[in-house]
């Protein structure tokens, strides 16, 4: 069966989700097979990019149904600076269970680095709070960057950060975000990452008084696990629906958002496609 979807230029002007479908097809057609840490094996490409205009709908995939609650709860967990899965489990989210130790701890993962990066002189840097303040005080700065990749802590993390650095950009009253993802599980992980960082952009824009611009997703190692190839081919047979609209509460405290503050309107999607997580 052919896996071709659309060439990249047409994909960009047709339905924005076709960029993701084109990435699936690209990996199936051009990916290099390699062994990996999990023992499953991957088919991968290197250096790809997709982008979404957040004024034209919320980029949650429609060619397979996603569990939006997990995406929202995980993002709120990151923003809390939490690194224990208790909050996730209390809210019915199990996506980190496989990596936690017997006490539910994950080591100094995303939340720790985002909210309390430890410096050599004993200080702690809250990157997210600093980001918000700097966006308000100096929107034209080129330093609106948050990184989760801390070489001093990587060996102590249950899973080193896959989506490891993001940058915000302000122009014409709009806030855009670019994410660099060093390792991208394109079938299972990337759909979550797209929605998560798009949502973060909407939240930060609301807090700092800007309109949402673009979410740009840049990939390093973009791969399909070898046990996801049939699922990817199945997804490629599906036509996307219009993107839904995300409504969020009018809050000015980024850390004051709760799950009930988000409403996704008009989400129509094809059925979920089951695939196993490689740990």
From Swiss-Prot:
Gene Ontology biological process terms in this record: dTMP biosynthetic process; dTTP biosynthetic process; methylation
The protein's Enzyme Commission number: 2.1.1.45
Record SUPFAM superfamilies: Thymidylate synthase/dCMP hydroxymethylase
Binding site for (6R)-5,10-methylene-5,6,7,8-tetrahydrofolate: 67, 185, 278
Gene3D superfamilies per record: Thymidylate synthase/dCMP hydroxymethylase domain (3.30.572.10)
A UniProt-annotated Pfam family: Thymidylat_synt
Pathway(s) of this molecule: Pyrimidine metabolism; dTTP biosynthesis
UniProt catalytic activity: dUMP + (6R)-5,10-methylene-5,6,7,8-tetrahydrofolate = 7,8-dihydrofolate + dTMP
Protein's UniProt keywords contain Cell inner membrane: no
CDD domains for the chain: TS_Pyrimidine_HMase
Keyword Lyase tagged: no
Family annotation (HAMAP family): Thymidy_synth_bact
Described purpose of this protein according to its UniProt entry: Catalyzes the reductive methylation of 2'-deoxyuridine-5'-monophosphate (dUMP) to 2'-deoxythymidine-5'-monophosphate (dTMP) while utilizing 5,10-methylenetetrahydrofolate (mTHF) as the methyl donor and reductant in the reaction, yielding dihydrofolate (DHF) as a by-product. This enzymatic reaction provides an intracellular de novo source of dTMP, an essential precursor for DNA biosynthesis.
Family: Belongs to the thymidylate synthase family. Bacterial-type ThyA subfamily.
Name the record gives this protein: Thymidylate synthase
Organism from which the protein derives: Caulobacter vibrioides (strain ATCC 19089 / CIP 103742 / CB 15) (Caulobacter crescentus)
Organism ancestry: Bacteria, Pseudomonadati, Pseudomonadota, Alphaproteobacteria, Caulobacterales
